[in-house]
Design a protein with these regions (language model features):
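Active-site anion-handling motifs in enzyme catalytic cores
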Residues: 1-316
Length: 316
């Protein structure tokens, strides 16, 4: 049987591409790379074993995959956006899921959603935790990468103003800013994977990565690069659900450093009326920038288990 992986072919988020790249590396050279949002329209005439991981989905009306696709569900997250929950967990799909259970989920909330309709499900972690650092420690730079670090909690016009209040002057010349998104929905698969590889290489060599992006943080954990995750501004229920079983892998900062960041009435009023500009007093982040703490969880066992499950599926 042919082998395949999924890719969101019009995504503007490199995190999606990194998740697909992790799957690509596990499969080897897949015969097919199928569009995550159009798995129901398989134009392939042969049967495919599909490694089915990632975030689902923008177009839930296009679910489930075509009959010739035999999915291995692992590292799955089901969003509350776009009425996806209604489509994914309708009674008519129970028999479909029964064929392919247990379902591996990257967060505990998704586990509960499947179990609620009687489908066997387990916490698998994310496939990006299988990425490996091909460089040596001597290749590490002194770069401190800020990857979309303040996107969720500081308005654009305030990021520069308050950045200098948050980080000490001794490290500012080591900081580089990286954007984890792009503006080209028509980017080729080759270019997507090339850019994802370049990001992984840079994360592999970094001294520290500060981010608010899950799929920057998790790859860095896999690569052995210290992560400081800004768990700030993610106050909606769907955001918190997405984090269950994820944020324990790295060190985090919370709202203590970023008042008025949430969706509470006071925070909303202060931002919308721009009172934020006058009442936000950034305080220097207390953190060991020169010798950042290692990530708190040893993922060796989980990485081995993920690889084993994928290998068993591909060889079945």
């Amino acid at each position: 049987m042919k082998k395949g992986i999924v890719l969101h072919k019009s995504s503007l988020n490199y995190g999606d591409d990194i998740q697909s790249l992790a799957a690509y590396k596990l499969v080897g050279r897949p015969d097919y790379i199928l569009d995550r949002e159009n798995l129901h329209l398989s134009d392939v005439n042969e049967n495919i074993q599909l490694l089915c991981n990632g975030w689902y989905m923008e177009n839930p009306q296009n679910w489930p995959p075509a009959e010739n696709i035999y999915p291995f569900f692992i590292s799955l997250h089901v969003t509350h956006n776009n009425n996806t929950i209604d489509f994914f967990f309708s009674k008519k799909l129970i028999d479909y899921y029964k064929r392919f259970e247990p379902i591996g989920c990257r967060d505990y909330h998704t586990v509960r959603l499947f179990r609620k309709i009687g489908i066997k499900a387990y916490y698998s972690g994310c496939l990006t935790l299988t990425l490996e650092n091909k460089f040596n420690e001597k290749d590490r730079t002194d770069e401190i990468l800020f990857v979309d670090a303040f996107n969720k909690n500081l308005p654009v016009e305030l990021r520069t103003k308050y950045f200098n209040q948050l980080v000490p002057p001794t490290i500012r010349d080591k900081i580089k800013f990286i954007n984890h998104s792009h503006s080209n929905p028509n980017m080729s698969i080759e270019e997507r994977f090339k850019n994802a590889e370049l990001l992984i290489e840079r994360y592999s060599k970094a001294h520290l990565v500060v981010t608010s992006r899950i799929h920057c943080a998790l790859p860095c954990v896999a690569l052995g690069t210290p992560v400081l995750f800004l768990d700030v501004g993610f106050n909606t229920k769907k955001s918190r659900n997405r984090f269950e079983g994820v944020t324990n892998y790295f060190n985090t900062l919370n709202n203590n450093y970023f008042p008025y960041s949430g969706i509470d009435p006071v925070g909303l009023i202060f931002r919308r009326t721009e009172l934020y500009k006058y009442y936000f007093k950034g305080k220097e982040i207390k953190y060991n920038w020169e010798s950042p703490p290692q990530n708190p969880v040893n993922i060796g066992g989980l990485r081995k288990e993920l690889k084993s499950k994928v290998s068993n599926f591909l060889n079945s």
